[in-house]
Amino acid sequence: MPIHASTTLFHVSDTHFGVEDRAAMAWFENAVREERPDALVCTGDLTQRATHQQYAAAAEWFAGLNTPIMLQPGNHDMPYYNLWERFRSPFARFGALDKAVGAQLELEHALIVPFDTNVPAQMRWPWSDGVVTRKKLDAALNRLAELRDDPRPKIIACHHPLLPERDGAKNPTIRGDLAFKELAEAGATVVLTGHVHFPFDQIRSRDNFAMRMIGAGTLSTRLRKGAPPSYNVLRIDQTGLIDVEKRDFAL
């Protein structure tokens, strides 16, 4: 394998096919085609209502980027109108898309570990915020244990931010603090997320274990807090140093 000076990773989230911003999507497509990143990560909410039509549009778009991509589901990627399917097989439609266009990324200078923070229902309303389950957390921890001796930085990819926007605020992700601490303790150094539709880049800690939290914005029309459509570019060098560039679409 040739040795390169750095790995370039495009981090996008919340495309929300069905209410996508087509101009912003074209802007992102052009960047992918011109710059040829090593890989893409999409941290959830690929669709707006998880309809077959929206998944078909997502499949066509992601396949057309012609770049290795890791897809993570978001709360919008479970059936909204078909409750039977939502409870019986919530990720069947997402799984078909992931099988068609998704990839397990093997990057030269980083390791990406998926972590699912979605549940089809919960004992609160709305059902949109994250829930950490022991089973899914253990799956991510087991993967980190397998990678323990690999010197490359371990990057978690999930949909929901694991911590609230600021310390002291109520955490909308149930057991997110626990997951943050255990993942950091297991060797993860970065967590990529979406969900909130505005970008951020923070160093946060719990119980003396720190991780860098990097959130991507959205490429949809569902804008929040005055933030324009955006995505992130991560450049990871041979030493594991990660530079993050936030790119905003000019409205």
Spans of model-derived segments:
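Active-site environment of divalent metal-dependent phosphoester hydrolases
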Residues: 18-20, 48-53, 75-83, 119-126, ...
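Beta-strand-turn-beta hairpins that frame and shape the catalytic cleft
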Residues: 2-10, 104-114, 149-153, 205-212
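Active-site neighborhood of phospho(di)ester-bond hydrolases with catalytic His/Asp-centered motifs
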Residues: 11-13, 40-45, 69-75, 116, ...
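Short acidic, glycine-rich surface-loop motifs adjacent to enzyme active sites
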Residues: 144-165
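N-terminal active-site segment of His-dependent metallophosphoesterases
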Residues: 1-64, 81, 100
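Conserved beta-sheet core of the metallophosphoesterase superfamily
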Residues: 168-239
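A short C-terminal boundary segment appended to hydrolase-like catalytic domains
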Residues: 236-251
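Extended active-site neighborhood of metal-dependent phosphoesterases/phosphodiesterases
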Residues: 56-139, 182-184, 207-209, 233
